[in-house]
């Protein structure tokens, strides 16, 4: 028999203080993301300091490609969770489980098709982004191993997204802790102990992601049986599949469209040489560590808005957006106090002091991006709020704005300013996206309030 709601495993975000609900949901997300980025930093440090700058460049040369493909997978799975959150907010649990059942079917198809196509075109994609010849072979091996893990990536993001749709962000955090610790241990064994190099880093990621999927399955079966479909809920439903795809595919495409701009930017940067590729890799690792707070406040807003839309509580949505913006601005001040004086020291985690050029260029990237963090924070809050309200097409258009901006930077700023042009790639993209998202959210919020009234 399927249980109904358990207060210990679910979190109703339609009641109580909006600020408290968002913080309670966001903290495990932020800690989990920081943990994940700390793993990536440790991984990059192991690769850069023990294998060499060339190996670090090999891993970095494929980063935008990974964002293109994994971004589509992760974004689609996040979109599949939106109808689940809305049905949970409306207390329609049978409908919620039917969405779960149909989203699993879609995810299996996505996993097979995306893995197959990614592996076939791996080499051609690396050539397309001007991967330096001296690191091409290592980049190819690393990327192929990442592609082999796509089914695990989709599985984890689908299941953890459904757990979070019910307001539980703690459990996926615990699973990330476990997977990250295993990943770091395997890095030590495979890279330092067995000398497998970049190949060892890829294998470690593959195994740890598989474990995270198994942990999600175990938790749902034991503690969140409210998500397990039964009887008629397991049937294929064309209408629900259509709703899931309408939410998931635009969110996936939003990440992929954004990634196309990143690929253009990285391609322009790769053409500058290996030192700049290594600097880009190091700076992106630290950047993601700091920007994860903005990202996960946004993720919290998607679930918050989804549940409150299902409960038809539009005023709480506006209150939540304002509270999130205040949180974002406070956090920006903290990042500025850390990044501006200590950016150079942070970059020395990845390379020896003798690699002065890499350190200098990477620190410059961090400082320029930091000035524009409020633009990024506003972007994530509004974009995820729009997604939670079920209008993924609008959020996808913001990704188009980012792509246009990064392509423009790649075609004009980088040839004119070289590395400094690369440093302005993200800030210009964030500003362009905000110019679209601010009026889009205001229009959508007024439109939905009229519908509810």
Could you say what each language-model-derived stretch is?
Residues 68-71, 115, 183-188, 213-217, ...:
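Hydrophobic transmembrane alpha-helices of multi-pass small-molecule transporters
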Residues 38-56, 126-133, 189-196, 256-289, ...:
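Helix-terminus/linker motif at the lipid-water interface of multi-pass membrane proteins
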Residues 15, 19-38, 42, 65-72, ...:
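Residue-level signal for short hydrophobic patches within transmembrane helices
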Residues 56-116, 153-172, 279-343, 376-398:
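Small-residue-rich hydrophobic transmembrane alpha-helices
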Residues 77, 145-164, 172-180, 201-214, ...:
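Short runs within selected transmembrane alpha-helices of multi-pass transporters and secretion channels
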Residues 1-26, 84-149, 193-249, 305-372, ...:
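Short alpha-helical transmembrane segments in multi-pass integral membrane proteins
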Residues 47-67, 133-138, 198-199, 240-247, ...:
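Interfacial/gating helices of multi-pass transporter permease domains
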């Amino acid at each position: 028999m399927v249980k109904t709601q358990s207060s210990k495993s679910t979190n109703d975000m339609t009641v109580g203080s909006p600020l408290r609900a968002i913080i309670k949901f966001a903290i495990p997300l932020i800690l989990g993301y920081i943990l994940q980025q700390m793993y990536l930093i440790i991984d990059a440090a192991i690769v850069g300091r023990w294998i060499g700058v060339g190996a670090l460049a090999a891993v970095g040369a494929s980063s935008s490609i990974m964002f293109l493909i994994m971004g589509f997978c992760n974004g689609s799975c996040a979109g599949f969770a939106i109808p689940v959150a809305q049905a949970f907010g409306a207390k329609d649990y049978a409908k919620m489980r039917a969405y779960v059942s149909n989203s699993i079917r879609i995810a299996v198809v996505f996993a097979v098709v995306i893995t197959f196509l990614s592996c076939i075109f791996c080499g051609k994609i690396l050539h397309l982004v001007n991967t330096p010849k001296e690191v091409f072979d290592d980049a190819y091996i690393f990327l192929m191993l990442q592609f082999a893990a796509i089914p695990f990536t989709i599985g984890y993001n689908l299941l953890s997204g459904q757990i979070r749709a019910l307001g539980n962000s703690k459990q996926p955090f615990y699973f990330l802790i476990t997977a990250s610790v295993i990943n770091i241990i395997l890095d030590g064994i495979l890279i330092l102990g067995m000398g497998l190099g970049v190949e060892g880093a890829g294998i470690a990621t593959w195994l740890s992601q598989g474990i995270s999927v198994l942990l999600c399955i175990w938790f749902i079966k034991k503690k969140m049986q409210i998500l397990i479909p039964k009887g008629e809920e397991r049937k294929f439903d064309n209408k629900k599949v259509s709703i899931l795809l309408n939410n998931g595919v635009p969110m996936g495409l939003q990440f992929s469209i954004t990634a196309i701009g990143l690929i253009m930017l990285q391609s322009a940067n790769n053409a500058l040489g290996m030192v700049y590729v290594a600097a880009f890799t190091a700076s992106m690792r630290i950047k993601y560590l700091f920007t994860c707070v903005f990202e996960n406040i946004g993720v919290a807003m998607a679930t918050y808005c989804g549940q409150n839309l299902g409960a038809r509580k539009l005023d709480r949505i506006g209150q939540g957006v304002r509270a999130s913006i205040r949180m974002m601005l406070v956090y920006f001040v903290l990042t500025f106090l850390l990044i501006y004086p200590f950016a150079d020291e942070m970059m020395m985690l990845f390379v020896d002091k003798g690699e002065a050029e890499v350190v200098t260029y990477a620190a410059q990237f961090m400082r320029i991006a930091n000035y524009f963090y409020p633009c990024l924070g506003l972007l994530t809050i509004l974009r995820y709020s729009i997604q939670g309200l079920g209008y993924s097409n609008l959020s996808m258009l913001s990704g188009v704005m980012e792509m246009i901006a990064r392509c423009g930077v790649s075609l004009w700023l980088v040839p004119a300013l070289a590395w400094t042009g690369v440093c302005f790639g993200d800030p210009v993209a964030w500003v362009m996206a905000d110019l679209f998202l601010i009026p889009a959210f205001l229009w959508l919020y007024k439109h939905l309030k009229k519908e509810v009234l």
